[in-house]
Structure formats: C-alpha cells, structure tokens
Amino acid sequence: MALLIIWMPGIHLFNGSCFNHTVIVFDQRGIANSTVGSKPYTYPQLANDTAGLLDALKIPKADIMGYSLGGHIAQAFTISHPEKVNRLILVATTCGGKDGIPKPPEFLKLQADVVNKSLHNIPITQELKALNVASLGSGWIKLHPETAVIPANTTSLQQLKPGLPPDIANKQNNLGSWEKTNWSGACDKEAKLAKPTLVITGTDDNNYMPHGNALILASKIPGAWLVQIKNAGHAVVDQYPIELSKIMNTFLSTTAPNNSMIH
C-alpha cells in the first residue's frame, strides 16, 4: 500500500473513504506530545528528525506532505534527503527567502499580541477573533458566519481546547516564535527537487501564508500541479477535507512512481 508521511494538524482530512493511502502523522519536536529536545529549532534539524523517523520505522521512501510550517519542513526534507521522497504535497505554505511573500506586518503584530497577552492571562477574545477570520478567510466567513464566533473573555488557546494540558497549550501559544528560525528559504533550490509535486492554496489566505506564495512555488518546481481553492483560507485542510482528499488521490494515482508501493 502507498504510504504518505505528513506533518499537519488536520488528520481528519484522511478519515473516511475519500483517501485510500496509509498515512503516518507525527508531532515534530516541541509540538503537542513530542519533547523539545536539546537541539536548536531549525528547518534542517526538523527535516533530519523526519529522516530519523523513517529510518526507525524502516521505511526507505515515502510520499511527503507538509501543511503551513510543515511545508517548510517538507521542502527542507526533500532537498536534504531526496532519496527518501517519492512525491511531494505542499499545502498553504511558502518557499520563503527573498522570493517568498511575507506575512503583513500588522498580522505579525497580531500574532505576537496573542502570545504575549495569553501568557499574562489577559483576555484575547478580539485578537483571536481576528486570527480566526484571517485563518478562515472572508469567503468562508460569509458562507459560515457561525465559525467566526470566539467565546468572550478568552485568555488562552487552552480555553478553546479544554482537554489540552497547560504545558502543551503553552507550546502552541509560542509556536509563532518558530517562524523566526534563521531559514534562508528554499526558492532557489526548488528547481532541483525533481519530484512530482502538488501545491494547494486557499485563495483567501492573505495573512498566514499569502496565497501568492503557491504561485511562486508552482512556477519554480518543474511540472508542479497547482490547485487554488475558492472561499478557503489558511485553514483549507479543515474547510474542504473531502475535496482535498479527492485532489490528493488524483495526484498520487496519476503520478504514481513504480517504486511507491510498500508491501
């Protein structure tokens, strides 16, 4: 059966009959239940962690998917360990560096305010509402206005996820600091990937990973597929899981290399 290794939160994307591949999902260091470790947070290090996982599982090669920050790691992994990659799926991400489109300054400030206020137990209801709208996109909000509601007097992400232990909630609150990692980007290396690649973006992702980055990615990777989802924001994997499952299945079945089957 074909095997897909991913780093992303939307595991429900692969539940049900729309996706017919075996999927391995894991938490990178410092995320959810994975320990922080002693090594610095860099994309090359996280890529090496992924390679180590494959080695530990005795999986020589797999299809790789990365969503958002995971897309950075997936690119770094494919560049540094091409022998372990069959195909590449990049969702709501960027190749970074000088060619990448950065987050708007006002959005970076908003993210920083959420982290700082939540750590000091200051209500962040309005800030989270703004983040939520940015994540979902204006088109989705118009179709589903109820999804923009945030409980009043929310002071941390843990309140939105009551079952989340405080230490894990704090890790997630500080996740934005990861993006300050000294990463020069992968735009100048994309042409060397030489792997069948699918790039997916929501057309309303204007803040987290501006959707123009997907066009840049697709233009730099030879033969890349580009899919733009209307009325979808950065949360495209949560908004259109069935549609994305079908798109990925089509890509994986159409571009299937001879050595992609793992028995």
Tell where the protein language model's regions lie, with residue ranges.
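Conserved HGGG/HGGXW glycine-rich cap/lid loop of the alpha/beta-hydrolase fold
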Residues: 1-39
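Active-site loop/oxyanion-hole signature of alpha/beta-hydrolase fold enzymes
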Residues: 24-65, 69, 80, 246
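Hydrolases whose catalytic domains are alpha/beta-hydrolase-1, hotdog thioesterase
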Residues: 73-77
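Flexible "cap/lid" loop of the alpha/beta hydrolase fold
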Residues: 79, 86-123
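Conserved alpha/beta-hydrolase catalytic His-Asp/Glu region
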Residues: 124-173, 177-184, 188-189
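Short beta-strand/loop motif that positions the catalytic acidic residue
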Residues: 193, 199-202
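Conserved alpha/beta-hydrolase "acid-adjacent" motif
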Residues: 206-213
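Catalytic active-site module of serine/aspartate enzymes centered on a nucleophile-bearing elbow/loop
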Residues: 221-263
